[in-house]
Swiss-Prot record:
Residues 148-341 are extracellular. GO terms for biological process: cell septum assembly; FtsZ-dependent cytokinesis. GO terms for cellular component: cell division site; plasma membrane. This is Cell division protein FtsQ. Residues 151-219 form the POTRA domain. Residues 1-126 are cytoplasmic. Keywords: Cell cycle, Cell division, Cell membrane, Membrane, Transmembrane, Transmembrane helix. The keyword Glycoprotein does not apply. The keyword Transmembrane applies. Disulfide bonds: none annotated. It is a single-pass type II membrane protein.
């Protein structure tokens, strides 16, 4: 205990604790920065060997008592304060070291211990493994079916033929018996069969375990035209698909250059397809020198002036009604004013 320049006594114990950042008697106060986190309270309490009282200016009684204490008592008190401060500092240092070692051991144990694998990762790996195995199995099965004769062609079924022969279809398809079904390109087979003149369309299908089915649609003659090599049959698209005697009651077509891209041919076919069935059976010839000048000749010699293909459905309906009336020439080129002569 000493005096300042103003004569006020100074508590050396309080001054020393202010320097080291620890409150007197190692008790600490809220907000003191000197106490290390994790300090063992038991160690600090054990380090206190004697209670120390802090002297302030607000305690005159204590001030008077300390002012008149003897030198021996003051020396003993100061030694006790130093011993208490030393013990508290040792306790704080030991607590700090213990906390540091505990944190180090915890970090080491966490680093050395293997981390458990998440359940989601395990499920994902299992799903991936199963997918890969199924893919490999499916690929192996497909490869086996592609090369093995276990599922090969043993029978070829052909449907839809009337005038086209089975041999023509098989020759065009080019499929050999014993060929694995998976090696057959069905689109290519259908295209090859459709190349036959009398075939309008074709379809090839695999029928497991050992059959190939080919379905065709033959062309149907709609009109016929005479050529030097004989009569040629044309279907509804204007395709010349056969040179053969025409079926009975098939009308002849008179155009310059019949074909699927000829405008006059297409116009004449539009008219024939618009006629009622009972009228079509009476048509012997259809002439189309141009798309706007179409004429029908009936089997009994009567003539029908049709005109262009405009309003073909209306003209066909009016013509069916007019043919019930006597006459030699029927004009439906203007369906609003049909006439009979």
């Amino acid at each position: 205990m000493t005096e300042t320049d103003e004569g006020a006594p100074v508590n050396h114990s309080a001054t020393m604790w202010a320097v080291v950042g620890v409150p007197p008697v190692c008790g600490g106060q809220p907000g003191d920065s000197g106490v290390v986190a994790g300090t063992s309270r038991a160690l600090v309490d054990a380090a206190i060997i004697a209670p120390v009282t802090t002297l302030t200016r607000d305690e005159p009684a204590q001030y008077d008592r300390y002012e008149f204490e003897g030198p021996r008592r003051r020396a003993r008190r100061e030694r006790a304060e130093r011993r208490a401060a030393q013990a508290c500092a040792i306790a704080i240092e030991e607590a700090r070291r213990e906390a540091k070692h505990r944190i180090h051991r915890q970090m080491s144990s966490e680093a050395n211990s293997p981390k458990p694998v998440a359940r989601g990762v395990v499920r994902g790996l299992k799903t991936l493994f199963a997918t890969v195995m199924f893919s490999i199995a499916g690929f192996g099965l497909g490869l086996a079916l592609y090369v093995t004769p276990a599922m090969s062609v043993r029978n070829i079924v052909v449907t839809g033929i009337e005038t086209v022969t089975r041999e023509e279809v098989l020759d065009a398809a080019g499929v050999q018996l014993g060929t694995p079904l998976l090696q057959i390109n069905t689109n290519q087979v259908a295209d090859q069969v459709a190349a036959i003149r009398r075939v309008a369309s074709a379809r090839a299908q695999r029928q497991y375990p050992s059959a190939l089915r080919i379905t065709i649609v033959e062309r149907v003659p709609v009109v016929v035209k005479d050529f030097p090599d004989g009569p040629h049959l044309f279907d509804c698209d204007g395709v010349d698909f056969a040179t053969a005697p025409p079926p009975p009651a098939l009308p002849y077509i008179d155009v310059g250059h019949p074909g699927p891209i000829d405008p006059a041919t297409k116009a004449a076919l539009v008219v024939l397809l618009a006629l009622r069935p009972e009228v079509v059976s009476q048509v012997a010839r259809i002439a189309a020198p141009s798309v706007s000048s179409i004429t029908l000749i009936l089997t009994d010699g009567r003539a029908v002036i049709w005109g262009s293909t405009d309003r073909a459905e209306e003209k066909a309906e009016k013509l069916a009604a007019l043919l019930t009336q006597p006459g030699r020439t029927y004009d439906v080129s203007s369906p609003d004013l049909p006439t009979v002569k």
